[in-house]
Amino acid sequence: MIVLSVGMPRAGSGWHYNLINDLMMASGAADARVIREKYKLQKILTEVNCNISVLSARRLGMVSIPALLGNTFVIKAHSSPTTASRFLTSLGLLRVTYIYRDPRDAMLSAYDYGQRALAKGRPNAFSHL
């Protein structure tokens, strides 16, 4: 089974992923970082938090292989549901958790994040706010 940890950007989704991953590992699930290495999924599950990015049929198909082989693990995304993710959810192969943050607070967090990046000379997508 794949547990998908989803959240809007700047909502604490990294913290949410780590919390869910640690809880799942404590209950016997595999560490997604180990799954990523073992099944050569580095191009699909990126970043420290095993972010799948787009929930396309191809990407979900690739990460389904370890799940179909009996592994349970957690991955992260910021994207909205797709036909492929809904299908895997209906089969019980994908379970979804979601973290929500008041959009006004998330906007302030994004603004602060962008300003800190500008101050360091490394502008990002939030720097223009």
Task: Describe the residue ranges of each PLM region.
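PAPS-dependent sulfotransferase catalytic domain
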Residues: 1-129
